[in-house]
């Protein structure tokens, strides 16, 4: 039917949620409008909603691990501010996102911190699936309330120094070396942070949102985005 109508379409992988079982496929006409954002490859048959699409990590760094260094970063809270102040690329920073995750029983919850490279964007669907909870069970945490329990400090949170908190680490960070991360202390960051030596994640998985131009997870060609 799609072909007879002259439509450009793909069989698209879609996410079914943490409780939904296996991945689903749906036929979508590619256009500039539509309910879903779709990542697709013109060099192979890969097509998936951006919520579902796997992200190809950068190659592991071959740098030697440098000594951990605590540095003053007065008032520098965003990735852009920190990167500019320390004169490093955003890809050499670690971004922290803080969440409150509700349990099955009323009033039950835990805190979680997700960490991705500073130049990447968090894919909320991947995070929710990694936590194994319904979508409505996850919300951004109040920084002050979470800080009182876990040691997180708004704008200066990193994976080192947190406690009573589930740490979810994007898989790409495990192969990157000498990154900048918050020191869990106001106005301070750490330089030369390395996974394994300085911190570990309770969950390590792909947390990244795919963008136009990123590598196709099947063939490696640049992906494109459309609606459908």
Stretch-by-stretch model annotation:
Residues 1-228:
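Extended, low-hydrophobicity, polar/charged segments
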């Amino acid at each position: 039917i799609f072909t007879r109508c002259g439509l450009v379409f793909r069989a698209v992988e879609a996410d079914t949620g943490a409780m939904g079982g296996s991945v689903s496929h749906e036929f979508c006409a590619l256009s500039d409008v539509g309910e879903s954002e779709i990542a697709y490859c013109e060099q192979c048959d890969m097509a998936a909603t951006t919520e579902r699409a796997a992200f190809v990590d950068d190659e592991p760094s071959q740098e030697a691990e440098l000594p951990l260094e605590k540095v003053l970063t007065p008032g520098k809270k965003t990735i852009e501010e920190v990167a500019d102040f320390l004169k490093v690329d955003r890809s050499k920073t670690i971004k922290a996102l803080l969440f409150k995750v509700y349990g099955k029983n009323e009033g039950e919850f835990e805190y979680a911190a997700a960490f991705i490279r500073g130049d990447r964007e968090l894919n909320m669907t991947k995070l929710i699936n990694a936590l194994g909870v319904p979508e409505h069970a996850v919300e951004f945490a109040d920084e002050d309330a979470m800080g009182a329990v876990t040691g997180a400090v708004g704008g200066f949170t990193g994976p080192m120094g947190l406690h009573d908190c589930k740490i979810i680490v994007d898989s790409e960070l495990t192969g990157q070396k000498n990154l900048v991360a918050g020191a869990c202390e106001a106005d301070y960051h750490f330089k030369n942070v390395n996974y394994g030596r300085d911190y570990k994640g309770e969950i390590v998985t792909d947390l990244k949102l795919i963008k136009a131009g990123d590598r196709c997870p099947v063939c490696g060609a640049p992906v494109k985005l459309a609606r459908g």
